[in-house]
Amino acid sequence: MRINMGIQKKLCAVVLLLSMLQSTMIYAEERVYGITEYGPVSVNGNGVGRGQDPTYQYIEDLLYNRQGNSNPSGTNPTPGTTSAPANPGVQNNGGGNTATTQERKWNLAKLSKSGQTKTIASEVNANYVVVFDLDQGTILGEKNSSATMNPASMTKVMTLLVAVENLPDLEKKLTITQDIVDFVKARGASNCGFVAGEQVRVKDLLYGVILPSGADAVLALAKEVAGSEAGFVALMNKKAQDLGLSSECRFQNASGLYHSTHHMTVKDMGEIMAAAMRNSLAREVLSTENYQIPATNKHGNGIKLTNLFIQRIKTQDTGGASVTMAKTGFVRQSMFCSVSSGKGGNGKNLLVVTGYSSSTWQCIMDHAALYKRFG
């Protein structure tokens, strides 16, 4: 019996995937079936960041019938640069990092449903959903938007915001310490692939927090800002109060690792994202698809980082929407979640938050469906 060549390739991909699951590569908690929020953690020290393992990328290309080019533009970003979409009027101010692109008009966390708010049912897989119209300050659609959930690595949007507001010198180099490496390894946490003794610029660490969801970058920045993660978390909770988030919003760590009292609502997450979007540097980081960390003392070729949500949603039917900013997350208690922002096909500026989707790709498809429906 002759087997179709396409089927043969997919069978080979499955075999490779199974062999990878039995390898010595370290996986974070979200590595269900080897297909994750982004992909396997790289610990081989060869400059390949999380989600950029070439074997894994080859497998995904086969499974999803892609051409095997992880950078759709066909080019590699220059070290220390990005391939972010243009944001008119947004500049990296390089110091202070408190410049805003727009004034706050409303608190998304405190918005209530209106008569025009649509109830979102079975058309998306996620259990927690909110869709905001940023132009009108309204909730277009929702599902359990006032219920408490664990934000997982969406937490890192607040981490980014607090860091940029407290670190004026983007060129300062911080050292990745052995305790950071040990912490990440012990918990199987998402990381950028930094090693002990590596010296990395603050600017590069900021991108490392968001694009590969790097806990190593988070801990280095937290220590620099507040002396410890606990001190940094106190600043995060203070920022939550300043933003007027709900009483359900509480941080226990800076990476989004599961804790029973680390939680918020999807509306809270929406306001955190909106606050980050008002900061020019945070907005730039969140809207970057590819970023090249330049050579360090430990990685001679630097490290390439990719926001795979932004990359992958381009393959989905969004009804003409352009999704330009995103941060994903996973813990078992809230499954796959994401916050994103973009312009709908009809010109509406939307912000979407979902929680408890069943898989990486289901989360992406949920967002695509919501942009198509409400954009």
Model-assigned labels for residue ranges:
Residues 3-12:
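Bacterial N-terminal signal peptides that target proteins for export
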Residues 14-22:
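Bacterial N-terminal signal peptides
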Residues 25-141, 145-149, 167-168, 173, ...:
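Structured C-terminal helix/loop/strand segments within mature extracytoplasmic catalytic/sensor domains
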Residues 30-39, 47, 58-61, 66, ...:
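Active-site-adjacent loops and short helices of periplasmic peptidoglycan-processing enzymes
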Residues 243-244, 280, 289, 328:
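Residues at alpha-helix termini
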Residues 278-319:
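Conserved active-site loop region of the serine DD-peptidase/beta-lactamase
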